[in-house]
């Protein structure tokens, strides 16, 4: 009698691999929480920021499926980092729906920082959900006929076979911030900066921009009260907006939106290029990580975010970022 051990092992591996991948991507990695540590090397004129610790979180997309245990994990981790300042770069909710106002409020109230908590809005945070429609144009997406599969296929086709351009549908008009979300934020430690800037004790400017997809991105208005003698931290949900800020001041831009993207292949290089294109960004090379723009003397950090419409993650775990400000004479 012959026992084909090798064949049996191979068959088992073939069956087990996709099952284990599915379990990992749906149930394990979405609940991991990775910390990214960055250093901002300060020029002499900004030496007064030495030692400042800024924590960024982004893209929570809180909905009924967001586990309470995961929210507590985020809160504990942020607290353990002892941030001087906390920034949230948009997409508090999912598809313009506040599904659990108490859960969101309690989570946000569990976060704090002595210099303040600041936020901008993302494309999910307006009165109507804004994304790419079935033609690849930026448009409002009705809940009753969102056609997610067709929109996804259009997005994939555009990403792989043509360039994704930030083109608005002809009928699209600027969207107002979600009123329910605004009422929640009003009762939390977070100060929403919607095309606004604040100056903290003659130390630093904080600028928050409206979302680009919502047609609320207005840097001219946002920088009106900017103090050019001080450093500036800019919150802008969509990293594509970095190129619209060339004529404006500011030293560090925090963004999110792309989620990494949520399914990412770090190798081989061509696979990473393809998955980055699936982020839907006009500039897919900005899908995640730290970028330097020497001409503007500016840094951009694109956060992978914490959640998503679907809690699926593969080689792109949820992220908290901490940036230390360091001056070395």
From Swiss-Prot:
Enzyme class: hydrolase
The reaction(s) this protein catalyses: UDP-2,3-diacyl-alpha-D-glucosamine + H2O = 2,3-diacyl-alpha-D-glucosaminyl 1-phosphate + UMP + 2 H(+)
Signal sequence, renumbered to the chain: none
Annotated membrane topology: Single-pass membrane protein
Positions annotated to bind a divalent metal cation 2: 91, 123, 257
Gene Ontology molecular functions: metal ion binding; UDP-2,3-diacylglucosamine hydrolase activity
Binding locations of a divalent metal cation 1: 59, 61, 91, 259
Cofactor(s) the record lists: Mn(2+)
The protein, known as: UDP-2,3-diacylglucosamine pyrophosphatase LpxG
Organism: Chlamydia muridarum (strain MoPn / Nigg)
